[in-house]
Amino acid sequence: DWPVSSGAPLDGIAVALSRQTSDGEPPGGWTPDEVLSVDQALTAYTAAVAEQAFADHEAAPWGRLEPGAVADLVWLERDPHSVAPQEVPALRVRATYLAGRRVD
């Protein structure tokens, strides 16, 4: 709802983690009390999206990793928990899976 990042998920996750643009503005971030943890940001881009799309209650739900769920996911080169927020957008996608099949 505001122009702080592109539509790329990793860009949005970085903003959620820092409340700053990719240039580090503003210092301290917008509303720093709204900074999300990595787990909260990943949930916002996965399980929360599925819930908004009413796909979390289907016979084969998506948006989370659990038995019976649709395996749509990306495998990143590094764990987002292990990098600084400003490094998240540069994480390379090692593989993409749709319905459990590698598609890259």
PLM regions and their residue ranges:
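His/Asp/Glu-enriched, well-ordered alpha-helical/loop segment
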Residues: D1-H81, T96-A99
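P-loop/Walker A phosphate-binding loop and immediately adjacent motor/lid segment at beta-alpha junctions
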Residues: P85-D104
